[in-house]
């Protein structure tokens, strides 16, 4: 059992016998009213999203999910096929099921992901916190005011755009932090 104040992004709770992923949780306490937790939830089975406000002392059932290592096998349209690295079982997910990691999923990637199962059904995939990707396009370096941290836009092979350091060039391998939508960490070693 969890209380409302213990909810955080990534927590999975059970509502009406379905697993719901907490995507966002914001704790608020005012002088007059009791503390509340505003949450954005996603049903892991249907993909339905909703917002619910919980009292800090509301009791909620948490869900234990099974996790296995998997790699991306291939992409066919909006269907992504992942393979279990231990028994080579293939699992399919739609693009909407993995929308939070979709900007960093690309054909031929070798990252070992964490496949998340509920009642032996694959419901989502989580990438490692740091991944390495190749810069497909970026502008040239800016000359002049470089006293601070100078960033410029770059595009990855799958079309994802993010800001990178000014010295990064086309073809460079960069490290990306996949939490919170992804951000540039540095040049890959």
From Swiss-Prot:
Pathway: Protein biosynthesis; polypeptide chain elongation. It comes from the Bacteria. NCBIfam families: PRK00529.1. It is found in: Cytoplasm. The gene is efp. It comes from Pseudomonas syringae pv. tomato (strain ATCC BAA-871 / DC3000). This is Elongation factor P. Involved in peptide bond synthesis. Stimulates efficient translation and peptide-bond synthesis on native or reconstituted 70S ribosomes in vitro. Probably functions indirectly by altering the affinity of the ribosome for aminoacyl-tRNA, thus increasing their reactivity as acceptors for peptidyl transferase. GO terms for molecular function: translation elongation factor activity. GO terms for biological process: peptide biosynthetic process. SMART domains: EFP, Elong-fact-P_C. GO terms for cellular component: cytoplasm. Belongs to the elongation factor P family. Its main location: cytoplasm. Keywords: Cytoplasm, Elongation factor, Protein biosynthesis.
């Amino acid at each position: 059992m969890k209380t409302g104040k213990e909810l955080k992004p990534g927590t999975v709770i059970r509502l009406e016998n379905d697993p719901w992923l907490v995507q966002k949780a914001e704790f608020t306490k005012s002088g007059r009213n009791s503390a509340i937790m505003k949450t954005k939830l996603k049903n892991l089975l249907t993909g339905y999203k909703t917002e619910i406000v919980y009292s800090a002392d509301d009791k909620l059932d948490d869900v234990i999910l099974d996790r296995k290592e998997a790699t991306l096998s291939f992409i066919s349209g909006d269907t992504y096929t992942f393979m279990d690295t231990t028994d080579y079982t293939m699992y399919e997910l739609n693009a909407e099921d993995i929308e939070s990691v979709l900007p960093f999923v690309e054909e031929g990637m070798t990252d070992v992901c964490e496949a998340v199962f509920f009642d032996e059904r694959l419901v989502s995939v989580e990438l490692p916190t740091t991944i390495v990707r190749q810069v497909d396009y970026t502008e040239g370096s800016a000359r002049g005011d470089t006293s601070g941290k100078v960033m410029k836009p770059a595009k990855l092979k799958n079309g994802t755009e993010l800001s990178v350091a000014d010295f990064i060039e086309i073809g460079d391998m960069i490290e990306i932090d996949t939490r919170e939508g992804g951000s540039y960490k540095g040049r890959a070693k």
